[in-house]
Structures are given as structure tokens and as C-alpha cells.
């Protein structure tokens, strides 16, 4: 099994950055408290507060799938109401089940491992 990473670019609706950050805090707290196979979940904001880049790092494709199934529905609804997905990139060995789950995000670019330090 290989680790899986994802990079998601979200466009923040004008004036909604604080709500998006609140949702992000919920996701990060939940992962820290109850999802040991989520290795990292980080949100980065551009200087204008218009774009958020999410870096996700999972122990495996199964861990990413489990995270998607465990997401707080209220926080997910808040994020969906105040952002739009600009792009999604997934890195690592992914399963058909994970691909199916990610299909709801729109077009997803997948990259398989080629060369790595680890």
C-alpha cells in the first residue's frame, strides 16, 4: 500500500473566508481526534483570501476513502456553500472505489508514483 496525497484548489465566495476557515478547523480537529490514518490535513490561503489550497495526506487509498465517509456533514455543507472546486489532483495508488467517491468533485487528475525519496 502506498500513501495517497491530494491537492484541492477552492475558490472562496467573496466575504466567506471566515466561514470556510471554520469548516476547515472542524475537518482538521475531527481528523486529529479520530482518524489516525490521516497523516496531515492543511489549508493554505492566498494573500487576497480568494483561494484556499488544501493539502491532504493519507496512509493509503482506504484511509482517504474512510476520511471522505467520516466528514462532518454540517462542515461539508458549509464548505460547499461558500466555495467552488477549481481543481483536484490525487497522487499515489488509488482504488476504483476511491475514484468513484471522488467523481462527485468533478474532474480529478490522477498521478501514479514514479520516483520518490521514500
Report residues per predicted region.
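A short, acidic, amphipathic alpha-helical segment used as a generic capping/interface helix at domain edges
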Residues: 72-76
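Short S/T/G/P-rich N-terminal loop/turn motif that feeds into the first structured element of a domain
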Residues: 1-52, 59-70, 81-118
Amino acid at each position: 500500500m502506498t500513501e495517497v496525497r491530494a491537492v484541492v484548489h477552492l475558490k472562496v465566495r467573496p466575504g466567506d473566508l471566515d466561514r470556510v476557515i471554520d469548516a476547515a478547523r472542524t475537518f482538521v480537529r475531527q481528523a486529529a481526534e479520530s482518524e489516525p490514518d490521516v497523516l496531515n490535513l492543511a489549508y493554505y490561503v492566498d494573500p487576497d483570501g480568494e483561494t484556499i489550497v488544501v493539502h491532504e495526506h493519507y496512509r493509503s487509498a482506504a484511509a482517504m476513502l474512510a476520511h471522505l465517509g467520516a466528514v462532518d456533514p454540517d462542515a461539508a455543507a458549509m464548505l460547499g456553500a461558500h466555495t467552488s472546486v477549481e481543481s483536484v489532483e490525487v497522487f499515489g495508488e488509488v482504488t476504483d472505489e476511491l475514484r468513484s467517491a471522488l467523481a462527485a468533485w468533478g474532474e480529478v487528475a490522477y498521478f501514479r508514483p514514479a520516483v520518490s525519496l521514500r
